[in-house]
Design a protein with these regions (language model features):
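Leloir-type glycosyltransferase catalytic cores
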Residues: 295-315
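Short amphipathic alpha-helix
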Residues: 10-17
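Short catalytic/ligand-binding loop motif for oxyanion handling, primarily in non-cytosolic enzymes
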Residues: 6, 33-40, 100, 144-147, ...
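Secretory-pathway luminal glycosyltransferase catalytic domains
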Residues: 33-180, 194-196, 306
């Protein structure tokens, strides 16, 4: 089923379809990677789904098989009658579009107790940021370094453009209020303007040294840009997410920590996609790169990957 981000797409799609068809749902235990160290979330973050895991060999099941036809959203066409006749349906694919499950998002999130997990992470790791404006940024490198024809590494320009976009959007939002709104919300606006900004970046341990150097280049690029709010940039703090904790954060905890931030700059990664999607801040600004796949996967249509409220930024 892949890593956490890929699994979440498959999980949410499966449960959403079961709600639509008014059936139960199961996950094959041998496909969940429950015994792997990298999949600790099945005993923590996703532990509620253990009761829906089965030891049955899916090869011996007589269920209707539905295979994803292409990368873009394509409504899953399986009739309830066919599901009843064959005893169930097997889904094969990535299903990487919010449209597969967006209508059932709240119900599914309640089922896996998402809010409880987010609150635990927030209390443990986010306290120091409560009085700041926080932008999370995910840098995806790792195995991408060896498969850039499929998954390109997003360059510094994207992160510079995204920070500029977020800051200008905030300023335009404040300046665009009418007189009555400004009067009623004066205190709120004042607090927004005086809050310090924190750029909280996330990466794998093996990439930290390289990302640390890239952060310095990003800071320099912002300072040299004539369109940047220089005072804001000079006062912006750049920190590695979860780096100051005594205990190493699991990957699912880092994902949820990103979701607690005010705004999100995601990489071309299903992992940080979910961090932004889980963010329940009504005023969040989400930036995603215009290049999601490399030339070898240029046939993958990503038009339905991200919600329309998110912002495609040049990378």
């Amino acid at each position: 089923m892949g890593g956490l981000g890929n699994q979440l797409f498959q999980i949410y799609t499966t449960i959403a379809l079961s709600i639509e068809k008014k059936t139960g749902f199961i996950f094959p235990r041998n496909k969940l990677g429950m015994d792997k160290r990298s999949c600790m979330y099945w005993t923590s973050f996703l532990k509620e789904l253990n009761k829906n895991a089965t030891m049955k060999d899916i090869k011996n099941l007589t269920y209707t098989v539905y295979k994803e036809k292409e990368f873009k959203y394509d409504k899953i066409q399986i009739s309830s009658d066919l599901i009843r006749k064959t005893g169930g349906a097997l889904l094969y694919g990535y299903f990487q579009s919010y449209r597969y499950f967006d209508n059932e998002y709240k119900t599914i999130s309640q089922y896996i107790k998402l809010d409880e997990s987010r609150q635990l992470v927030r209390r443990a790791y986010y306290k120091k940021y409560e009085n700041r404006n926080v932008i999370s940024a995910h840098f995806r490198m790792g195995d991408y370094k060896y498969i850039q024809n499929c998954h390109p590494i997003i360059g510094n320009e994207y992160y510079i453009n995204s920070i500029k976009f977020i800051l200008s959007s905030i300023n335009n939002s404040i300046n665009g209020r009418n007189f009555k709104q400004q009067e009623v919300e004066q205190q709120e606006v004042k607090q927004q303007e005086t809050k310090k900004w924190t750029f909280l970046y996330f990466c794998e341990d093996e990439d930290f040294s390289e990302i640390k150097n890239r952060i310095e280049l990003i800071k320099s690029g912002l300072r040299l840009d004539s369109e940047t709010d220089i005072d804001c940039i000079l006062n912006m703090e750049f920190e590695r997410g979860g780096n100051d904790t005594k205990q190493k954060m699991e990957d699912w905890q880092q994902l949820l920590l990103m979701s607690c931030c005010d705004h999100n700059i995601i990489a071309n990664s299903s992992y940080s996609w979910w961090a932004a999607y889980f963010n329940n801040n009504n005023d969040k600004i989400v930036c995603y790169p215009d290049k999601w796949f490399g030339p070898q996967l240029s046939n993958h249509d990503t038009k339905d990957l991200c919600p329309s409220t998110w912002n495609k930024i040049k990378s």
